[in-house]
Amino acid sequence: MEQEQDTPWTQSTEHINIQKKGSGQQTQRLGRPNLTQLMDHYLRIMSQADMHKQTVSWKQWLSLKNPTQGFLKTRALKRWKSFNKQGWTN
């Protein structure tokens, strides 16, 4: 079986566990994360980014000063349509 070459991606995703034993340190490599761990990490990061976007959106919404009802309706419909196009990613 052919052994996988280290690439910048695989090197950056390797986990390193450092444990202190006595007066010295021992470094133990735990190997590469499996696909499930990578997907969990990706979804966690994307969820945090989505929360940030929602917070920014609400701050923009609250910062509007005396907008007309028609403007608010148009803005809300545009947001809703763009949200539905993106769909649920997590």
Curated annotation (Swiss-Prot):
Chain positions covered by the region annotation Mitochondrial targeting sequence: 65-87
Keywords: Apoptosis, Host cytoplasm, Host membrane, Host mitochondrion, Host mitochondrion inner membrane, Host nucleus, Host-virus interaction, Inhibition of host innate immune response by virus, Inhibition of host MAVS by virus, Inhibition of host RLR pathway by virus, Membrane, Modulation of host cell apoptosis by virus, Viral immunoevasion
Region described as Disordered: 1-31
Pfam families: PB1-F2
Biological process (GO), any one: symbiont-mediated suppression of host cytoplasmic pattern recognition receptor signaling pathway via inhibition of MAVS activity
InterPro entries found in the cross-reference section: Flu_proapoptotic_PB1-F2
Site feature Low pathogenicity, where: N66
Subcellular localization: Host mitochondrion inner membrane; Host nucleus; Host cytoplasm, Host cytosol
Main location: host cell
UniProt GO cellular component terms: host cell cytosol; host cell mitochondrial inner membrane; host cell nucleus; membrane
Signal sequence annotation: none
Protein family per UniProt: Belongs to the influenza viruses PB1-F2 family.
Anything else known: Is not encoded in all strains, and seems to be dispensable for replication.
Subunit structure, interactors included: Oligomer. Interacts with human SLC25A6/ANT3 and VDAC1. Interacts with host MAVS.
Function as written in the Swiss-Prot or TrEMBL entry: Plays an important role in promoting lung pathology in both primary viral infection and secondary bacterial infection. Promotes alteration of mitochondrial morphology, dissipation of mitochondrial membrane potential, and cell death. Alternatively, inhibits the production of interferon in the infected cell at the level of host mitochondrial antiviral signaling MAVS. Its level of expression differs greatly depending on which cell type is infected, in a manner that is independent of the levels of expression of other viral proteins. Monocytic cells are more affected than epithelial cells.
Name this polypeptide is given: Protein PB1-F2
Record organism: Influenza A virus (strain A/Memphis/110/1976 H3N2)
